[in-house]
């Protein structure tokens, strides 16, 4: 069973200490109430991962731990077999002792689009909402974050994160908690809050933006990445049923509408810093994620459209600053 005691001890000494009023009870409930049928199997795989000396750790140009010479061929095959127990791997990629985990998403490409526009992360307390397997948490640590906290309710993502952390030697600068943002109190403690690929899954996008604001300290920075459509300030796509075969897509605004939403929620210096069409090179089926991917969600006769006839995925990155309360 995954133990969160190290995180409790860590935040007891810093600006997040007030989180301890609610967090231990929430995570205790999660550990005892989570009924995902594969969780025992994933826990067994975590417990079987061998202890290795991490040696080389690269977190600035990617997430690369160890090298291909640090394990024997037999050990490497065992580690790869155990890591494959956590498929599908969606967010990455990772390289562990020469084993390349080729994830569905090239999350490093997204990071390369975001990084030039954000305030330096050195010494910052950072929250990543909907962090998936925690790939970007490690990149945040690579940029010098004092503490990178990710939240995502998926037990598989938590196990993937713990598998990677295991090979770092138990690095305590990054932590993933199996929670949704609606379960967080108003911490008002983070210097930077990221929400990437989450907003369009929320039934109330305004409420989500306000929840993000309530995690930031005054003058803190919001980094918001989401699907957008072309159009003016009043343009918002609400799919009648599915978008790219996903049922849980609710609101896809234009970049101008997104900017207005964020301004209305009490942010200043709001700006769109990047727009990018998602390509089938960035999101695709791999040997580590063998299910359907982006190419299956697009109209085969016109890849500018989804199979439902909506505009194909286009993503915008927005940066904003929290105005003082």
Curated annotation (Swiss-Prot):
Superkingdom of the organism of origin: Bacteria
| Single annotated GO MF | transferase activity, transferring alkyl or aryl (other than methyl) groups
Describe the reaction catalysed, as an equation.
carboxy-S-adenosyl-L-methionine + 5-hydroxyuridine(34) in tRNA = 5-carboxymethoxyuridine(34) in tRNA + S-adenosyl-L-homocysteine + H(+)
Broad class of enzyme this protein falls into: transferase
What Pfam families does the record tag this protein with?
A: Methyltransf_9
**Which of this chain's residues are annotated to bind carboxy-S-adenosyl-L-methionine?**
91, 105, 110, 130, 152-154, 196, 200, 315
Q: Which InterPro entries match?
A: CmoB, Mo5U34_MeTrfas-like, SAM-dependent_MTases_sf
Q: Which GO terms describe its biological process?
A: tRNA wobble uridine modification
UniProt keyword annotations, A-Z: Transferase, tRNA processing
| Enzyme Commission numbers on file | 2.5.1.-
> Family per UniProt?
Belongs to the class I-like SAM-binding methyltransferase superfamily. CmoB family.
Describe the subunit structure: Homotetramer.
Protein role: Catalyzes carboxymethyl transfer from carboxy-S-adenosyl-L-methionine (Cx-SAM) to 5-hydroxyuridine (ho5U) to form 5-carboxymethoxyuridine (cmo5U) at position 34 in tRNAs.
NCBIfam families for this protein: PRK15068.1, tRNA 5-methoxyuridine(34)/uridine 5-oxyacetic acid(34) synthase CmoB
- Give the protein's recorded name: tRNA U34 carboxymethyltransferase
Q: What is the lineage of its organism?
A: Bacteria, Pseudomonadati, Pseudomonadota, Gammaproteobacteria, Aeromonadales
- Name the encoding gene, please: cmoB
């Amino acid at each position: 069973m995954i133990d969160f005691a190290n995180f409790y001890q860590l935040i007891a000494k810093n600006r997040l200490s007030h989180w301890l009023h609610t967090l231990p009870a929430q995570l205790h409930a999660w550990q005892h109430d989570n009924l995902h049928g594969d969780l025992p199997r994933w826990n067994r795989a975590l417990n079987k991962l061998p202890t290795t000396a991490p040696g080389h750790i690269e977190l600035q140009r990617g997430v690369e731990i160890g090298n291909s010479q640090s394990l024997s061929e037999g050990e490497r095959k065992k580690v790869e077999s155990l890591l494959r127990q956590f498929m599908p791997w969606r967010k990455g990629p990772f390289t562990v002792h020469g084993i390349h985990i080729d994830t569905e998403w090239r999350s490093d490409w997204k990071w390369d689009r975001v990084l030039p526009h954000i305030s330096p992360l050195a010494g910052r307390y950072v929250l990543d909402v909907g962090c998936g397997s925690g790939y970007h948490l490690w990149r945040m640590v690579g940029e010098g974050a004092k503490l990178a906290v990710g939240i995502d309710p998926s037990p598989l993502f938590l196990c993937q994160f713990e598998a990677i952390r295991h090979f770092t030697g138990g690095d305590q600068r990054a932590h993933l908690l199996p929670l949704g943002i609606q379960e967080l109190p108003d911490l008002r403690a983070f210097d930077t809050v990221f929400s990437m690929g989450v907003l369009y899954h929320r039934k109330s996008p305004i409420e989500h933006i306000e929840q993000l604001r309530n995690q930031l300290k005054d003058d803190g920075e919001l980094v918001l990445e989401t699907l957008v459509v072309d159009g003016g300030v009043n343009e918002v796509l609400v799919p009648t049923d599915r978008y790219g075969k996903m049922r849980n897509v609710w609101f896809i605004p234009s970049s101008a509408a997104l900017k207005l939403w964020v301004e209305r929620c009490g942010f200043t210096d709001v700006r769109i810093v990047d727009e990018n069409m998602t390509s089938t090179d960035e999101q695709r089926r791999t040997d580590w994620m063998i299910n359907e991917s982006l190419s299956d969600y697009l109209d085969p006769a016109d890849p500018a459209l989804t199979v439902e006839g909506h505009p194909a995925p286009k993503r915008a990155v927005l940066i904003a600053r929290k105005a003082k309360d």
